[in-house]
Each structure stands twice: as structure tokens, then as C-alpha cells.
Amino acid sequence: ATCAGQDKPCKVNCDCCGERGECVCGGPCICRQGNVFIAWSKLMTCK
């Protein structure tokens, strides 16, 4: 996935978007796959 404002996709094992559109490895974040929001992850790393 590519987070808002990012010109490169997130790492495969860090495919999360933070509140400011940044790529994050830990929660809280939005797990993404393509352009579809999968689920909120508040405690675990998105994988």
C-alpha cells in the first residue's frame, strides 16, 4: 500500500498508515491492502 502523501509503498512488513499518512510499523494504524482499508490495528503490528 501507499499511504497518503507518500511516493513509495510501505515495506511489506510495515504496510500501515498513521494519522498523518506516514508509514508506521506499530499501532495505532490502518492496515491497508491496495486501496482497501482492512482493519484498525491498535495493539499489534500489521502484517
Swiss-Prot record:
The record's Pfam families line, in alphabetical order, gives:
D_CNTX (PF17492)
What are the annotated disulfide bridges? 3-17, 10-23, 14-46, 16-31, 25-29
What are this entry's molecular-function GO terms? sodium channel regulator activity; toxin activity
Keywords in alphabetical order: Disulfide bond, Ion channel impairing toxin, Knottin, Neurotoxin, Secreted, Toxin, Voltage-gated sodium channel impairing toxin
Does rRNA processing appear among the keywords? no
Coiled coil ranges (UniProt) are none
Q: Which InterPro entries did the record assign?
A: CNTX
Cite the record's tissue specificity text: Expressed by the venom gland.
Q: Which family does it belong to?
A: Belongs to the neurotoxin 03 (Tx2) family. 06 subfamily.
Q: Tell me the function of this protein.
A: Inhibits the inactivation of voltage-gated sodium channels (Nav).
Note what the entry says on domains: The presence of a 'disulfide through disulfide knot' structurally defines this protein as a knottin.
Protein name as catalogued: Delta-ctenitoxin-Asp2e
Cellular component aspect of the GO annotation = extracellular region
Manganese listed as a keyword = no
The protein's location, in the record's own words, is:
Secreted
Annotated organism of origin:
Ancylometes sp. (South American fishing spider)
Q: Which domain of life is it from?
A: Eukaryota
